[in-house]
Amino acid sequence: MASRLNPYFSFPGNAREAMEFYQRVFGGSLSTSTFGAMGTDDPALVDKIMHAMLETDRGFTLMGSDTAPGMEHDPGNNVSVSLSGDDADELRGYWEQLADGGTVTVPLEKQMWGDEFGMCVDRYGIGWMVNIGQPRD
């Protein structure tokens, strides 16, 4: 298998909800493992997500988990997930769903470099950038 680089998101207790949201946005197959399935009997953790992985038909892989007690959950603004390509309908569809219930920081519109570009933070605090380029011949 070739090496891959995949985003891994940490959530403050709502990983299942967030990963199911991304599955609705991107499609694909979602697998989850709870702390309970891995042997934890702590009632606060039994149903929380120890690891989730969403693999889509488009080749996207998103992973995530709930933050376990004793570990820090400190969302930042130093990383965003970038979606880019020239399939305008597909990318606008992702944009609309990701921005719904979130905060649009840069509206998805034509930019000075000629592409459509926008930035948002989704309802789970994850930053997204969408760039719709012109089809290249």
Each language-model region and where it sits:
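Vicinal oxygen chelate
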Residues: 2-3, 31-33, 50-55, 60-66, ...
